[in-house]
Amino acid sequence: MTNIRKTHPLLKIINSSFVDLPAPSSLSSWWNFGSLLGVCLAVQILTGLFLAMHYTSDTATAFNSVTHICRDVNYGWVLRYLHANGASMFFICLYLHIGRGLYYGSYMFTETWNIGILLLFAVMATAFMGYVLPWGQMSFWGATVITNLLSAIPYIGMDLVQWIWGGFSVVKATLTRFFPFHFLLPFIVAALVMVHLLFLHETGSNNPTGIPSDPDMIPFHPYYTIKDILGFLIMLTALSTLVLFSPDLLGDPDNYMPANPLITPPHIKPEWYFLFAYAILRSIPNKLGGVLALVLSILVLAIVPLLHTSKQRSMMFRPLSQCLFWFLVAVLLTLTWIGGQPVEHPYVIIGQVASVLYFLILLVFMPLTSIVENYLLKW
């Protein structure tokens, strides 16, 4: 008799995705981050659901409702800090997942890669709107600054901003509409994840060597299920440690002050995971130019597959490209640091140099280095 998991209409979909899925035998721990992102998304949706039961999206009560969750709701503080730090963990896994894709040439699966870029935009939008909801000082001023960037769009910019605000500044209507969108977007993200996996399973996974692994496949279960569970345990331990020992480590102290439109914080900045893009935005004196650079800092990833000039897929056997990749990581860390600094000398010039280097590495140096490597290998 055939196993029910192979015949049942629903179970056979799960079976072909997580049980009998053929996977390359050489996948390293860098391939764990996809499943870790799935766990992060599940944690965020569950904690967010319970937080939404107690939260009120009204400017008069939003800040107090978050305080009420932390003080009066049973384990409400755990939910709140799991959700806030879960977002940080989500972005750590997300950036490592993208880095893995760049290093090992996974971007050559263009459909999967492009859906991934859409996912990144959706997750960033979700995180931004979530940051506004506690209605602290940084929530209010962050929302004001970031939404105001849309006014740089010629002709329709100001109308668009006021349409999003629901008034002439960030008001009650803005908070009220951000809440349902913040609630809805994670489910759209979950749907996009399904499409992402659908395209991935059309081609099968890449592997560290970048060489087709069709002759050497193993079943996903039990080999990679066990490996993924170990990853879950490590990540959840790290998240729990952060939540229980230093929940405010990655937050901004200004957000413990209720939003006040009359007092501007000395230094407005987004959450740490947006600082690299914020630094690129600030490095261009022109408003429209800055906004374009901000969008392109993410969209540039879509151009990477078109600029792949190497005869090899992975960087595993390409030391020059490896050096360039780690230089790119250093540039991104520098941008993250600069994004959190005030707009003054020498931070301005460091940010401008790092921004130029970021685009140069991805668009010029990497393709040229690949051509040099091909020549050195006489290909």
UniProtKB/Swiss-Prot annotation:
Heme b b562 binds at H83, H182. It is a multi-pass membrane protein. Heme b b566 binds at H97, H196. It comes from the Eukaryota. The chain crosses the membrane at residues 33-53, 77-98, 113-133, 178-198, 226-246, 288-308, 320-340, 347-367. CDD domains: cytochrome_b_C (cd00290), Cytochrome_b_N (cd00284). Binds 2 heme b groups non-covalently. Gene3D superfamilies: Cytochrome Bc1 Complex, Chain C. GO terms for molecular function: metal ion binding; ubiquinol-cytochrome-c reductase activity. The cytochrome bc1 complex contains 11 subunits: 3 respiratory subunits (MT-CYB, CYC1 and UQCRFS1), 2 core proteins (UQCRC1 and UQCRC2) and 6 low-molecular weight proteins (UQCRH/QCR6, UQCRB/QCR7, UQCRQ/QCR8, UQCR10/QCR9, UQCR11/QCR10 and a cleavage product of UQCRFS1). This cytochrome bc1 complex then forms a dimer. This is Cytochrome b. It comes from Phyllonycteris aphylla.
